[in-house]
Amino acid sequence: MSGDNAMKSFSTGMPWGVRLPGLLLCLLLGTLVILPAGPLAAEGSRTLYPEDIAGARANLEWRVSTYGDFVLRRTLLRVYAEAGEYLLLGSSAVDVPEVPDEGDILVYTPGVVTGPIGNTTIDGDPAFSCREQRAETGNEAQGRINDRTEELAGPRTIADPGDATPGDTIPDGYIPCFYQVPETGIYAVVFYGPAGPGEDYEGTPNGEIELKEIPDEQGTSVAMWDVTVRASLTSTNDIQGRLFTYYLTLFTGENDRPLWSVVYVVSSDGYIYEIDLRGMDPNGFVLFANRQGFLDSDGKRLYRDVLAKPGMSFQAQNQLMELQGNTNLAGPDFPIFFNRPATATLQALDIPLEPEPPQVSNFQFIGTDDNVTRVGAGGTFRFTSNVDGTYQLVISRDGTNFDPTNPRNAVLRGFVTEGVNTVAWDGLADNGDPLPIGQ
């Protein structure tokens, strides 16, 4: 987060406890609150900043710099669409005065974007460019969201695709660029700010939500943007729950500009998180979700915030290029939706529609010496999990305090797979002392 050179971590879970002779422990498997899938509103900046929302606006970024030396400061959007449907696209960075030729909206077909999330590679040319379509239609208003009224109204219908003449419905909306999807799949959508694709100039966003005109100095960011899926150019029915990303890089322009947006994170086992920013004031930041959070110097989960090293330049600190204590960032894992995800989108991502709660069975501890547990000798835990995921196993020194941050306890963490899992333990607490015989 650019505001305080820190990044914060959140986690939730449900403990599962067991008492064995000589051992007192607690096993934690991650669990989430389930939210039903279904539509809410349109897809884009009007979703993040709906009518009457409080606080400030954060612009969508596309820059060449990174967070943590590997998460590019560019929001690569993804949208599930079925053959014959239309993507309707608009941006406040299209045809901006002074720099009319740099802002653009691009669409890439399935399979063109490859590589690890956070540092992806675009291996081919775009299938669509809003700027090129504007040149073909000759409609200078096409693809540009001019103000808050047009942002909230969304895309107008198109009566004549040849010159992008709008229909009479949704008169307060913007005239969209449009792309008809040739095949069913997940498409990538890129928004370039007025500075173009190869710059790192952040501009000076004003953070205003109620924009009455295209804001100056968007730089490498976009204030108002929209990706709407409809069945046809004349339809007024938005097909929702289709748009997502694996991480958001956003920029308010400065601090004291709180954010109140809501997004939805879906884990690979089908649970849905509703994430409410609740007035967070980060300035420039990246938002993503993963299995591990932040990592300690030994690669284990940290369960704490991370801070930039103070000796670096101001910009390097803001972008967390090196972290105190040789801690690290684990990369993004899970998709972030702007509405509750549509069933078809989850199916395309191979995410189950009905999540299965994690359960542990057949829990055993096997000592190192003919199944005899001696002080300081340790042994192996064996248990069966019904799902893939992560675990935290806390061995309490006194049977009362199961705090994983207490160095007098022993904490084991890692990944589990569906089926039988084994976890080795050296018999020591986190402070290096042997744990005594349990009471």
Model segments located where?
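Bacterial N-terminal signal peptides
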Residues: P21-L35
